[in-house]
C-alpha cells in the first residue's frame, strides 16, 4: 500500500473527502515553487499533483498553459521536477502524483522515468494524453507497478470503456467533470451525479476524484458528496500568476487551500 492508498483509507475513517491540489513544478521559479508546495502541504492539501511543464499542454486552459511557460523559462524540466520531489520529501509526507504529457516521458525514457520517479519519492503518475490501449509499451517497462497509475475518465467515455479504464487504474480515477480544457465553467451537478454513479458501479472500489470547473469552496462543497475527492488546479495557478512578484504568494495559495479543504 503506497501513500495514496493510505491517504484515502485515513480519509474514509475520518469521513472526509480528499483535496487534490495541482500546481506546475517550477512556477513561478523553482525556489518559490518549493515554498508554495510546502505551504500547500501545511495548509491541508491531501494529495499533490505536480505538473511537469510542457510546451504544448493541449488539455489545459490558458492559465495552466501560462504556468508551464513560466516554469520552462525558469529552467524546470522532468529531471529537476524529480529533484524537487526529493527535496520535498524531507518535510512533506503528502502523496505526490507526477502529472505529465507523454512526450516528456518518451524523451526521458520510460524505464528511467519509472525508476527516477520512485527514487524521488513520487507515489503515482497521471499521463494526460496516453489512453490505456496505447500505454502497454510504456508500462511493460515498469516491472513492479509500485507507482500508482492514475487514469482519466471523461463525460463522453462509454460505460464499457469506463470498466476497461478502471481495470488498468490504481491510486484513484480522475473523473473530468466536463468537456473542454481546465479552468472552464462550473460542472453540471445533475450530469455529474449520473457520471459518478455510473463510474462507481464499474471501478471496483478505486477512489474517484472529480476535477475541472472546481475553483471555489462552494464548488468543492457541492461536488464532494458525489466523489471521494476533488481536484483543484487552475484556482491555485491564478493566484500564483496574479502574485508571482509578491513575497506573500505562498501564503495566499495556502489560504485558498485551507478554504477549499474546510468546504470538504
Curated annotation (Swiss-Prot):
One of its GO terms (cellular component) is cytosol. The keyword Lipoprotein does not apply. Pathway: Amino-acid biosynthesis; L-tryptophan biosynthesis; L-tryptophan from chorismate: step 5/5. One of its GO terms (molecular function) is tryptophan synthase activity. Its EC number is 4.2.1.20. It is an enzyme of class 4 (lyase). CDD domains: Tryptophan_synthase_alpha. Disulfide bonds: none annotated. Keywords: Amino-acid biosynthesis, Aromatic amino acid biosynthesis, Lyase, Tryptophan biosynthesis. Pfam families: Trp_syntA (PF00290). The active site is at residues 49, 60. The keyword S-adenosyl-L-methionine does not apply. It catalyses: (1S,2R)-1-C-(indol-3-yl)glycerol 3-phosphate + L-serine = D-glyceraldehyde 3-phosphate + L-tryptophan + H2O. Belongs to the TrpA family. Tetramer of two alpha and two beta chains. The alpha subunit is responsible for the aldol cleavage of indoleglycerol phosphate to indole and glyceraldehyde 3-phosphate. PANTHER family: TRYPTOPHAN SYNTHASE ALPHA CHAIN, CHLOROPLASTIC, TRYPTOPHAN SYNTHASE, ALPHA CHAIN. This is Tryptophan synthase alpha chain. The gene is trpA.
Amino acid at each position: 500500500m503506497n501513500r495514496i492508498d493510505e491517504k484515502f483509507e485515513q480519509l474514509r475513517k475520518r469521513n472526509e473527502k480528499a483535496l487534490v491540489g495541482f500546481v506546475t513544478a517550477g512556477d513561478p521559479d523553482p525556489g518559490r515553487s518549493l515554498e508554495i508546495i510546502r505551504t500547500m502541504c501545511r495548509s491541508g492539501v491531501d494529495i499533490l499533483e505536480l505538473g511537469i511543464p510542457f510546451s504544448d499542454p493541449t488539455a489545459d486552459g490558458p492559465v495552466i498553459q501560462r504556468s508551464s511557460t513560466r516554469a520552462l523559462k525558469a529552467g524546470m524540466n522532468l529531471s529537476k521536477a524529480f529533484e524537487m520531489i526529493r527535496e520535498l520529501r524531507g518535510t512533506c509526507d503528502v502523496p505526490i502524483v507526477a502529472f505529465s504529457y507523454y512526450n516528456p516521458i518518451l524523451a526521458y525514457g520510460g524505464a528511467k522515468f519509472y525508476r527516477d520517479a520512485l527514487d524521488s519519492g513520487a507515489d503515482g503518475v497521471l499521463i494526460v494524453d496516453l489512453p490505456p490501449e496505447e500505454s502497454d509499451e510504456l508500462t511493460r517497462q515498469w516491472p513492479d507497478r509500485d507507482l500508482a497509475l492514475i487514469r482519466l475518465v471523461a463525460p463522453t467515455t462509454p460505460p464499457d470503456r469506463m470498466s476497461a479504464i478502471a481495470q488498468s487504474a490504481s491510486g484513484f480515477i480522475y473523473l473530468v467533470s466536463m468537456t473542454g480544457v481546465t479552468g472552464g465553467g462550473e460542472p453540471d451537478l445533475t450530469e455529474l451525479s449520473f457520471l459518478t454513479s455510473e463510474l462507481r458501479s464499474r471501478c471496483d472500489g478505486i477512489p474517484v476524484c472529480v476535477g475541472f470547473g472546481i475553483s471555489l469552496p462552494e464548488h468543492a462543497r457541492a461536488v464532494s458528496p458525489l466523489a471521494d475527492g476533488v481536484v483543484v488546479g487552475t484556482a491555485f495557478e491564478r493566484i500564483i500568476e496574479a502574485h508571482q512578484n509578491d513575497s506573500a504568494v505562498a501564503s495566499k495559495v495556502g489560504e485558498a487551500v485551507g478554504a477549499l479543504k474546510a468546504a470538504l
